């Protein structure tokens, strides 16, 4: 059984897209202004390794600004777009989709300082992650409170703020609780500003460079722990690999993702005990294409059931009536997501368990 200890954590654009309701079809003057600003034509900017992260991020930021503008009827800057519905398991838009957290996203113009307020969650995982225009990650916020966000602590005028809130996607009551927590998130600024792309990128050239770095990650086996972080914490090559393979990904201090490739389709078990996380862990089963199948494909530590020894025995396939059962099929594989891993994971004193298979 093949096991990869860390895979890239990607924040795909489609992951955070929200479907427009009928009222969002009405285009306001403010929305028109936003769309016009982010699509203004400028002379083509020469793409280099040094500005590749900027190119990818500016195009993604612009997409979000337009989406947020359409949904919130604002100029798309300085306001949250909340994802509140559980992902559709049949939707084949995002590969290896995350069923553990709901997302709240905002693009910030820090020409003026912003204030972020995160509510008390009573122990529920909620984290704020920042991505700058050059795709660096200046900091994370993991506790309730009020925080000042400015160019000094971000190192960039424009940043994307991504807030993840833990949820049990199968429980309508829990989805409602998370929705209420999302509504308590607050962003305030004297002037929300606007977002204007400072460059006109040649998209085919950007895609060509993206493919180049995607090839490098396969050749050099660069892991996600080497790709993300503050400016100066990664090499330029590793940084660009992260941009191309896992845009918006988190550092290993925030999450790690052991990946399991079972040797066959027989029933199997994975026994977890004392998983070294400050937040929570989860398991999601996928097919070879990265999609979920069946009815039971996700479990996390908030609703998994331990045995009398405090162990969580995850049952893959076999008897559907046992605790912690997950469906399997031809070509199945799974990811163990560990949010906010502790030192025991990194120093090796806690070992990722082996899958026991018939």
Tell me the role of every PLM-derived stretch.
Residues 2-9:
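Sec-dependent signal peptide recognition
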Residues 15-17:
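C-terminal motif of bacterial Sec signal peptides marking the signal peptidase cleavage site
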Residues 19-21:
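Bacterial signal peptide processing site
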């Amino acid at each position: 059984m093949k096991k990869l200890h860390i895979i890239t954590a990607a924040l795909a654009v489609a992951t955070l897209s929200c479907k427009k309701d009928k009222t969002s079809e009405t285009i306001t003057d403010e929305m028109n202004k936003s769309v016009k600003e982010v699509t203004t034509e400028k002379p083509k900017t020469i793409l280099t390794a040094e500005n590749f992260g900027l190119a990818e991020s500016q195009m993604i930021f612009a997409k979000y600004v337009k989406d947020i503008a359409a949904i919130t009827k604002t100029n798309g800057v300085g306001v949250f777009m909340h994802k509140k519905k559980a992902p559709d398991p049949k939707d084949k838009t995002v590969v290896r989709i995350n069923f553990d957290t709901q997302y709240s996203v905002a693009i910030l113009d820090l020409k003026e300082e912003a204030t972020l307020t995160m509510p008390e969650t009573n122990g529920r995982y909620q984290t704020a992650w920042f991505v700058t225009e050059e795709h660096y990650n200046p900091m994370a916020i993991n506790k309730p409170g009020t925080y000042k966000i400015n160019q000094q602590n971000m190192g960039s005028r424009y940043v994307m703020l991504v807030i993840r809130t833990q949820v049990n996607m199968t429980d309508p009551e829990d989805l409602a609780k998370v929705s209420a927590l999302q509504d308590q998130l607050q962003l305030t600024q004297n002037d929300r500003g606007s977002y204007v792309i400072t460059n006109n990128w040649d998209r085919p050239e950007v895609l060509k460079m993206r493919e180049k770095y995607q090839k490098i990650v396969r050749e050099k086996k660069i892991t996600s722990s080497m790709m993300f972080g503050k400016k100066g914490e990664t090499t330029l090559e590793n940084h660009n690999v992260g941009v191309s393979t896992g845009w918006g990904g988190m550092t290993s201090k925030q999450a790690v993702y052991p990946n399991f490739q079972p040797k066959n389709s027989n029933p199997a078990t994975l026994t977890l005990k004392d998983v070294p996380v400050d937040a929570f862990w989860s398991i999601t089963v996928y097919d070879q294409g990265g999609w979920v199948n069946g009815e039971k494909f996700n479990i996390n530590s908030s609703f998994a059931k331990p045995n009398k020894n405090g162990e969580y025995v995850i049952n893959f396939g076999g008897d559907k009536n046992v605790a912690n059962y997950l469906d399997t099929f031809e070509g199945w594989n799974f990811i163990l997501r560990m949010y906010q891993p502790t030192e025991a994971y990194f120093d090796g004193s806690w070992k990722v368990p082996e899958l026991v298979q018939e």
